[in-house]
């Protein structure tokens, strides 16, 4: 059913193309499900004439190949001197300034989340406790004598 409808539509398109003088290509379809072959019928035994091609020159060429004029083009400008200058400026700022100054900036950023400060403070506290004969760590974070608990009301 589908193959028959497809063949009918194909024949109609070829007939319309032939009556209007449009170039029509011979088309042949093969259905994968029903293994039917659909080919257009010959239209009154006439073979359509080959289309004539007319050369039309583009008045404004948009796509110029810069490599014909300058084989070492970097794509920044049509003029070779400006192209090389722009390439050098881009690479100078891209590598020298961004990489060198950027890495220096990252190296001198302040202490992230104060990790270095916390380590120095812990080392200072350990030295103080060892010098005064105190244990390095206590089980109580707060002095138990200073904590006031509510009274038991049974």
From Swiss-Prot:
Entry's localization field: Mitochondrion inner membrane
Keyword Electron transport: yes
Gene Ontology CC annotations of this record: mitochondrial inner membrane; mitochondrion; respiratory chain complex I
Ranges of Basic and acidic residues composition bias in the record: 66-77
Tagged with keyword Lipid biosynthesis: no
Domain of life: Eukaryota
Membrane-crossing segments per the record: 89-109
Record region (Disordered): 40-77
Transit peptide: 1-29
Alphabetized UniProt keyword annotations: Electron transport, Membrane, Mitochondrion, Mitochondrion inner membrane, Respiratory chain, Transit peptide, Transmembrane, Transmembrane helix, Transport
Pfam families on file: ESSS
Membrane topology: Single-pass membrane protein
Subunit organization: Complex I is composed of 45 different subunits. Interacts with BCAP31.
Function summary: Accessory subunit of the mitochondrial membrane respiratory chain NADH dehydrogenase (Complex I), that is believed not to be involved in catalysis. Complex I functions in the transfer of electrons from NADH to the respiratory chain. The immediate electron acceptor for the enzyme is believed to be ubiquinone.
Family (UniProt): Belongs to the complex I NDUFB11 subunit family.
Protein name per Swiss-Prot or TrEMBL: NADH dehydrogenase [ubiquinone] 1 beta subcomplex subunit 11, mitochondrial
Annotated organism of origin: Bos taurus (Bovine)
Gene it is expressed from: NDUFB11
């Amino acid at each position: 059913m589908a193959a028959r409808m497809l063949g009918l539509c194909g024949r109609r398109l070829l007939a319309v193309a032939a009556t209007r003088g449009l170039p029509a290509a011979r088309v042949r379809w093969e259905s994968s499900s029903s293994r039917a072959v659909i080919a257009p019928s010959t239209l009154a035994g006439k073979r359509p004439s080959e289309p004539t091609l007319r050369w039309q020159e583009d008045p404004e060429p948009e796509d110029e190949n810069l490599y014909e004029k300058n084989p070492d083009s970097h794509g920044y400008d049509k003029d070779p001197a400006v192209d090389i200058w722009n390439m050098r400026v881009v690479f100078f700022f891209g590598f020298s300034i961004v990489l060198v100054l950027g890495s220096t900036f990252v190296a001198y950023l302040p202490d992230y989340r104060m990790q270095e400060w916390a380590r120095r403070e812990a080392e200072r506290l350990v030295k103080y406790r060892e010098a005064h004969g105190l244990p390095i760590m206590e089980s109580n974070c707060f002095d138990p004598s200073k904590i006031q608990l509510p009274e038991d009301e049974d």
